[in-house]
Amino acid sequence: MALLRGVFIVAAKRTPFGAYGGLLKDFTATDLTEFAARAALSAGKVPPETIDSVIVGNVMQSSSDAAYLARHVGLRVGVPTETGALTLNRLCGSGFQSIVSGCQEICSKDAEVVLCGGTESMSQSPYSVRNVRFGTKFGLDLKLEDTLWAGLTDQHVKLPMGMTAENLAAKYNISREDCDRYALQSQQRWKAANEAGYFNEEMAPIEVKTKKGKQTMQVDEHARPQTTLEQLQNLPPVFKKEGTVTAGNASGMSDGAGVVIIASEDAVKKHNFTPLARVVGYFVSGCDPAIMGIGPVPAITGALKKAGLSLKDMDLIDVNEAFAPQFLAVQKSLDLDPSKTNVSGGAIALGHPLGGSGSRITAHLVHELRRRGGKYAVGSACIGGGQGISLIIQNTA
């Protein structure tokens, strides 16, 4: 929808994204959000006591404190005890949804300043044993369930997420070569943006322990900037014989978090915040679960229609790269301009910590739009189970 009140982004930060089992594996999703929240509060000069609500998106609930996630983040960073907190889950759209829900609270005047976040520690996703709480039968083998793999499989249509991408490849005539070439482009664009310092404004460095002692992590760990097309072409398909999806052209499992602080126009004036961008509108749409990756098409189309804008008005477009064929299907459907779409690479390069990607995309669009002097940007993600979500922002510089 288009917003009923003026809502502005006054801070947007994210952690570097860690590789699966990498440098961030010992930090919980709560820890990661705390790092991003502290950085956002500091960068936006937002006193914690001005926060009226804390909303954090998280999917896997992978740590023992996950049920308390948003509440603990607020308390850790000094938000008043009286301020409420909500942990939500719209799967891969959770980071975007935290901002959408924050906008709704501001538009209904339930809040004036909201700390919105998205986070995931995929590395900490546990194995579980079901049906043992009330005892087991003699001789019954206990089965360990990988909660991460289970979460990436849609039991309703009995398809792993990768197969939904294969369905899109077949429907839109997308070849394996198309996918590998796009994956290479994602890595190369990430490399160019990283070397140019284009992630610096959004990044919240983290001190990590390594074999060489403590060091500051400020670069995404999953990216493989030296990747070649030949290397990508040599990888086997994962989900289907002669398929298109490989480990090299799918988003990387990773760990990371982002925080976007939003405020009403009244709060911006009252607290003298510096608005970085205005939230123009958003849209959520359902789609066929068997081709869930096409979700950004109705989501982006719906958001633009509500806002009275078109794709030509957008200076930047960022669609989460869950899988190369999924992104290419969206690009083909909407006829997206490659020169302004995913300009700094995407999840194929830097990883997709489920709940964190919407926050990461929004933070990057905020700062990249300002760097380029553009006016409008739209970010979007497909969502397992068959949904899409999108968010339109406007540069206030």
Curated annotation (Swiss-Prot):
The modification N6-acetyllysine is found at K25, K137, K143, K158, K171, K191, K209, K241, K269, K270, K305, K312, K340, K375. GO terms for molecular function: acetyl-CoA C-acetyltransferase activity; acetyl-CoA C-acyltransferase activity; acetyl-CoA hydrolase activity; fatty acyl-CoA hydrolase activity. Residues 1-16 form a transit peptide. Its main location: mitochondrion. The active site is at C92, C382. This is 3-ketoacyl-CoA thiolase, mitochondrial. Transmembrane segments: none annotated. Homotetramer. Interacts with BNIP3. The keyword Lyase does not apply. Its EC number is 2.3.1.16, 2.3.1.9, 3.1.2.-, 3.1.2.1. It comes from Rattus norvegicus. The modification Phosphothreonine is found at T119, T136. In the production of energy from fats, this is one of the enzymes that catalyzes the last step of the mitochondrial beta-oxidation pathway, an aerobic process breaking down fatty acids into acetyl-CoA. Using free coenzyme A/CoA, catalyzes the thiolytic cleavage of medium- to long-chain unbranched 3-oxoacyl-CoAs into acetyl-CoA and a fatty acyl-CoA shortened by two carbon atoms. Also catalyzes the condensation of two acetyl-CoA molecules into acetoacetyl-CoA and could be involved in the production of ketone bodies. Also displays hydrolase activity on various fatty acyl-CoAs. Keywords: Acetylation, Acyltransferase, Fatty acid metabolism, Hydrolase, Lipid metabolism, Mitochondrion, Phosphoprotein, Transferase, Transit peptide. The 3-oxoacetyl-CoA thiolase activity is inhibited by acetyl-CoA while the acetyl-CoA hydrolase activity is inhibited by acetoacetyl-CoA. It comes from the Eukaryota. CoA binds at R224, T227, S251. The record marks H352 as: Increases nucleophilicity of active site Cys. It is found in: Mitochondrion. Induction: Up-regulated in liver, brown adipose tissue, heart, intestine and kidney by DEHP/bis(2-ethylhexyl)phthalate (at protein level). InterPro entries: Thiolase, Thiolase-like, Thiolase_acyl_enz_int_AS, Thiolase_AS, Thiolase_C, Thiolase_CS, Thiolase_N. Expressed in liver, brown adipose tissue and heart (at protein level). The keyword Cell membrane does not apply. Pfam families: Thiolase_C (PF02803), Thiolase_N (PF00108). Pathway: Lipid metabolism; fatty acid beta-oxidation. The modification Phosphoserine is found at S121, S310, S333, S344.
